[in-house]
Amino acid sequence: MSFTDKQEALVNSSYEAFKQNLSGYSVFFYTVILEKAPAAKGLFSFLKDSAGVQDSPQLQAHAEKVFGLVRDSASQLRATGGVVLGDAALGAIHIQKGVVDPHFVVVKEALLKTIKEAAGDKWSEELSTAWEVAYDALATEIKKAMS
């Protein structure tokens, strides 16, 4: 099944909703990650020495990058049917930080919860599926770059 124009539009519109409250949704995203995997705190330089998830420019920049990469994956999937990493160093960075397969599952869950929060009454299974497909394609490419 190919990624449709509608799926791309759903990802784009909910990404814009996410960016409307980047500070709040960034804190929400990392709070969900640490609730699921407290040990993951050490993977993020902007969290490892803090008492908890505190808003910061680094936290917002990283969240915006993660969500932006998934949005870009949606665009690539619709246009070409595949995803190519724009940053070849992503694999090496994830290896250096100690990221392992279960971390991708935790991030996916946190991403979906955050988008659900941002989308509000526009949340739907169709929206969830669009984000899941785009995230899974991105995660697959990052994992390939890690091997």
From Swiss-Prot:
Binding site for O2: H62
Binding site for heme b: S45, K65, H94, K97
Tissue expression: Root nodules.
GO cellular component, one term: nucleus
Keyword Iron among UniProt keywords: yes
Coiled-coil segments: none
Domain of life: Eukaryota
Keyword terms: Cytoplasm, Heme, Iron, Metal-binding, Nitration, Nitrogen fixation, Nodulation, Nucleus, Oxygen transport, Phosphoprotein, Transport
Subcellular location: Cytoplasm, Cytosol; Nucleus
Domain Globin: 2-147
Pfam families: Globin
Induction: Locally down-regulated by cadmium (Cd), thus leading to nodule inactivation and impaired biological nitrogen fixation (BNF).
Entry PTM: Nitrated in effective nodules and particularly in hypoxic conditions; this mechanism may play a protective role in the symbiosis by buffering toxic peroxynitrite NO(2)(-). Nitration level decrease during nodule senescence.
GO terms, biological process: nodulation; response to cadmium ion
Record-listed Nitrated tyrosine modification sites: Y25, Y30, Y135
Residues found modified as Phosphoserine: S45
GO molecular function, one term: heme binding
Subunit annotation: Monomer.
Homology family: Belongs to the plant globin family.
Reported function: Leghemoglobin that reversibly binds oxygen O(2) through a pentacoordinated heme iron. In root nodules, facilitates the diffusion of oxygen to the bacteroids while preventing the bacterial nitrogenase from being inactivated by buffering dioxygen, nitric oxide and carbon monoxide, and promoting the formation of reactive oxygen species (ROS, e.g. H(2)O(2)). This role is essential for symbiotic nitrogen fixation (SNF).
Protein's recorded name: Leghemoglobin 6
Organism encoding this protein: Medicago truncatula (Barrel medic)
